Amino acid sequence: MNSESVDSDVAASTSNKGNELCSSSTDITSLSVSSPNESVIHSSHSASEADEYVCKLSYEGNRKKRIYNGSAEAGKEKKLQKQRAQEERIRQKEAERLKREKERQQREQEKKLREQEKIAAKKMKELEKLEKERIRLQEQQRRKEERDQKLREKEEAQRLRQEQILNKERQQLKLNNFFTKGVEKRIAPNENFVADKTDELNEFEKEFRPFFIKHQMSLSKYPSPNESDSFLDEVLSTSKSYPLKLNDIFTPSDAVSSANSLGVSNRNSENEVRQLMSAYQDPSVSKPQEILSCLSQIPIKFIFFYQDVRPPYFGSYTKTHSHGSNVLLNPWLEDEDIDYTYDSEAEWVADEEDDGEDLESEDEEVDNSDDIVEDGDNAFVDDEDDDKDSVNASNTHRSSGPLEVIVEGPVWDSKFLPDFNCLSLIEPISSFSASTYLQIDPKEDLWASQDTAPASSGMTIGPTSSLSDDLQVRFPSEDIPKFIEYVRNSHDNKVFLIENLRHMFPYVTKNIISETLGKVAVRKGKSVSDGWIIKENFASLLSS
């Protein structure tokens, strides 16, 4: 309820009471007269005075009522203001409380965010640490792999060098059949040093040469229970008068166990290998890889002696000894199926002569006069005689060992070849003929007289050539600059250089290449880095 409604109600009640007082003036007069304490009022008052008095009282009452009503309204207004102020304070306190709550929540949220950031930073540091550790381990592993790779490459290079050395030795041994050894300059050994070295060697080292385990080899150990040093010392220091035998040291059980460890069995391994080889060569076999795996399990022997000139034997040996396992107890037992008097070393021994290298081969021991164009009726007659002499001389350099005869043919292809008769030539061109590679001049008159030879031959340099007499060689004049240029840039020895020149000039024979090489160039030295020097007479022919 507001103040205006209260004021209207108070005024209405006051006017009503005033009216009631005015209407009951008689009652008031009577009351005033009848009152024992009233001494002022007299009965003589008139009615008008009474009415005036009553109105005055009514007015005074109304004024007091109005004053009372105003004070009540002011109290109510103060009370309302106080209530509103209290409500305002409550609202402010609630707003402050909400503000503080909001700030507290915000601070808690910020604190949580800071904690999350700290946790994330800690996790990030841990991840970075793990990543650094992983990179360090990876780098360490990479360096280790690089070291291992370098070590493997070094071992592989060393193995390849050893194989190259062995292959070179084998090739050199094979080349000894075709080339004679030159005079080797041997330095006189120091006698004092040899004597001192001989004194240092004991009887065992003098009897048995040093042995080295090579690639793809393994040293088998004899499984004897009595091979300790103490037992051998006791046997060697014994004072018995009779000589010791192998049976006194090694028992038969040791021999049997040794035979089993070496892969010796009672089965006929020779026949087994032959069956495997025949099965592998059979085209109807569906799985040849299984046969190869069986062949790879056969033990391989490497037989080589330091005094041998021939290459060592490297392969399978499955023949059984005629004496069986007794050969394990007595290695000097001779097999009845082997001819020990035959010396195959003679096939590899070459005669030592001082004639130098012989570059002839069997397929070139023919007359090479057809490979050149004659410069007259009597051209190169002396050279042909020289070729015959060189062929006869090369025959003396051949090995004196027995030759194996191989007979092949005739082979008739009656099922396949008839279908292509219409496509074949009457006389096919031979790929081994030197005339196939000769260049044919399309402008040359082949039906002209043979007496009118061309001014400059393709295979010789005659008197009409631009070269002088001391520069005449039996080599195509147009290829001499190319020949000299290749020789000058080469570091190969004479044998390999001639072979390379043969591949470069297939239409020129080996004799002419060797002769031309000896005339135009000379080797600087014998080392690999040394090359060839072109003689001054042919230096002007180098291509610019």
Curated annotation (Swiss-Prot):
GO terms for molecular function: H3-H4 histone complex chaperone activity. The lineage of its organism: Eukaryota, Fungi, Dikarya, Ascomycota, Taphrinomycotina. This is Chromatin assembly factor 1 subunit A. It is found in: Nucleus. It comes from Schizosaccharomyces pombe (strain 972 / ATCC 24843) (Fission yeast). Residues 76-176 form a coiled coil. Residues 1-52, 67-117, 138-160, 351-400 are annotated as: Disordered. The region N-terminal to the PCNA-interaction protein motif (PIP box) also contributes to binding of pcn1/PCNA. Keywords: Chaperone, Chromatin regulator, Coiled coil, DNA damage, DNA repair, DNA replication, Nucleus. Belongs to the RLF2 family. InterPro entries: Cac1-like_C, CAF1A_DD. Disruption phenotype: Viable vegetative cells but sporulation is inhibited. Decreases the level of pcf3 protein and decreases nuclear localization of pcf2. Abnormal heterochromatin organization at the peri-centromeric and mating-type regions; heterochromatin formation in the sub-telomeric region appears normal. Residues 74-117 have a biased composition (Basic and acidic residues). The gene is pcf1. Residues 351-388 have a biased composition (Acidic residues). Disulfide bonds: none annotated. Residues 56-170 are annotated as: Interaction with DNA and pcn1/PCNA. Residues 325-396 are annotated as: Interaction with histones H3/H4. A motif (PCNA-interaction protein (PIP box)) lies at residues 172-179. Acts as a component of the histone chaperone complex chromatin assembly factor 1 (CAF-1), which assembles histone octamers onto DNA during replication and repair. CAF-1 performs the first step of the nucleosome assembly process, bringing newly synthesized histones H3 and H4 to replicating DNA; histones H2A/H2B can bind to this chromatin precursor subsequent to DNA replication to complete the histone octamer. Plays a role in the maintenance of heterochromatin.
